[in-house]
């Protein structure tokens, strides 16, 4: 039996990728070339943790919150379900009630609202705070979205961020889902082992189950 191929659902990181307005631009350069070193090329990377496909740790929005290395890495590996929630301004309990989510631990939402990694969106569909308790009741431990944030871009309260982690639900942002169909997959989206960080870039991949 042929094993299903892994599918990349990450935004490629390059010097053209969009960043949050005012945040650190992404930059990669060869700072020590083979010609200079005599043996190797050595690259230098500068970026915000919240550029491209990434996870949030509670420390991102709570000074007393857990940091990346405190998070349970088991959450970022395992079965996941992709569902389509396109053409919605916001997503909460009401919009998900008709989906079969029993037994789902990781849920990825396709909004198809913004597919340009090199342009930061002006507005995005966001999650309403009431989604957190609903997802928790279903046993979901991770929510993934194909936009830069689970909250509105100009929001300062970050109600969805706070409520999701209050209910034990981890956040994965900026996944790329327009090239995959709805259904069940195995997900790997492991954060780097960053001791004091408020988030981490990830290489998110899926394969059909």
UniProtKB/Swiss-Prot annotation:
Which residues of this protein are catalytic?
A: 60 (proton donor/acceptor)
Where, in this chain's numbering, is Zn(2+) 2 bound?
A: 56, 161, 173
Pathway per the UniProt entry: Amino-acid degradation; L-tryptophan degradation via kynurenine pathway; L-kynurenine from L-tryptophan: step 2/2
Family label: Belongs to the Cyclase 1 superfamily. KynB family.
Q: What does this protein do?
A: Catalyzes the hydrolysis of N-formyl-L-kynurenine to L-kynurenine, the second step in the kynurenine pathway of tryptophan degradation.
Recorded hits in InterPro entries, A to Z, give: KFase/CYL (IPR007325), KFase_sf (IPR037175), Kynurenine_formamidase_bac (IPR017484)
Subunit and interaction comment: Homodimer.
Q: Which cofactor does it need?
A: Zn(2+)
A Pfam family of the record is Cyclase
Q: Which GO terms describe its molecular function?
A: arylformamidase activity; formamidase activity; zinc ion binding
Residues annotated to bind substrate: 20
The EC number(s) given in the record are 3.5.1.9
- Which UniProt keywords are given for this protein, alphabetically ordered? Hydrolase, Metal-binding, Tryptophan catabolism, Zinc
Cite the binding residues for Zn(2+) 1: 50, 54, 56, 173
Q: What is this protein called?
A: Kynurenine formamidase
Fetch the Gene3D superfamilies from UniProt. Putative cyclase
Q: How is the cofactor bound?
A: Binds 2 zinc ions per subunit.
Single biological process term from Gene Ontology? anthranilate metabolic process
Q: Which reaction does it catalyse?
A: N-formyl-L-kynurenine + H2O = L-kynurenine + formate + H(+)
* Source organism phylogeny: Bacteria, Bacillati, Bacillota, Bacilli, Bacillales
């Amino acid at each position: 039996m042929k094993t299903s191929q892994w599918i990349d659902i990450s935004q490629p990181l390059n010097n053209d990728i969009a960043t949050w307005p005012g945040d650190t631009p992404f930059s990669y350069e060869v700072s020590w070339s083979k010609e200079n070193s005599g043996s190797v090329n050595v690259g230098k990377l500068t970026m915000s943790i919240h550029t491209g496909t990434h996870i949030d740790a509670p420390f991102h929005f709570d000074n007393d919150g857990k940091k990346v290395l405190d998070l349970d890495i088991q959450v970022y590996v395992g079965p996941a379900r992709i569902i389509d929630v396109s053409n919605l301004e916001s997503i909460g309990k009401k919009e998900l009630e008709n989906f079969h989510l029993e037994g789902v631990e990781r849920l990825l939402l396709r909004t198809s609202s913004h597919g340009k990694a090199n342009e930061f969106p002006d507005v995005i569909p966001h999650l309403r705070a009431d989604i957190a308790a609903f997802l928790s009741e279903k046993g979901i431990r991770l929510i993934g979205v194909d936009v830069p944030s689970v909250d509105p871009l100009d929001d300062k309260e970050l109600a969805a961020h706070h409520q999701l982690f209050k209910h034990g639900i981890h956040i994965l942002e900026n996944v790329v889902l327009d090239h995959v169909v709805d259904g069940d997959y195995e997900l790997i989206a492991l954060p780097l082992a960053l001791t004091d960080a408020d988030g981490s870039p990830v290489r998110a991949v899926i394969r059909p189950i």
